[in-house]
Amino acid sequence: MKKTKVVCVGEALIDRIRNKSNEGFTDFLGGAPANVACALSKLKIDSTFIGRLGSDDYGKKFITQFNKLDVNLDFLQVNNDSSTRVVNVDRDKFGDRFFSGFELSLIHI
C-alpha cells in the first residue's frame, strides 16, 4: 500500500485571541495550512509545510512544533528581516469571530 503524502501551502501565523474577560490575549500557533500539516502528521500521514516565517521567537516555536510532529520543512522560508505574522481574533456580541492585523500584510510579500 502506498503511503499518503500531503503538501500544505500557505500561512503559519499567531492567532492572538482575546480572553473572555476582555482583559488581555492568549497567543496560539495558527494558520489553516500549518494546522492541517500538524494534524495530518498526528494521524501518521506524511505532510510537508510550504510557507514563510519570521526568524523571531514565534517562528522558532513553529519550527519546534513542526519538528516535534515530523512535518517536512524542506521548502520552508525563514525571513530574517521580518517577524511572524500575528492576527488578532475578537468576538462580536453574537460570538462570531472577526480578525484584524492583516493591514500591513503586503509588506511581507
For the regions a protein language model found, what residue spans apply to each?
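Positively charged, low-complexity intrinsically disordered leader regions
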Residues: M1-N19
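Residue-level detector of alpha-helical segments with a strong bias toward transmembrane helices
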Residues: K20-S21, S41
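Short pre-catalytic strand/loop immediately N-terminal to key active-site residues, enriched for Gly-Thr
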Residues: S21-G30
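Conserved donor sugar-nucleotide recognition element shared by glycan-biosynthetic enzymes
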Residues: L29-V36, Y58
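Alpha-helix C-terminal capping segments
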Residues: N35-D46
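Conserved N-terminal subdomain of the carbohydrate kinase-like
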Residues: D46-I107
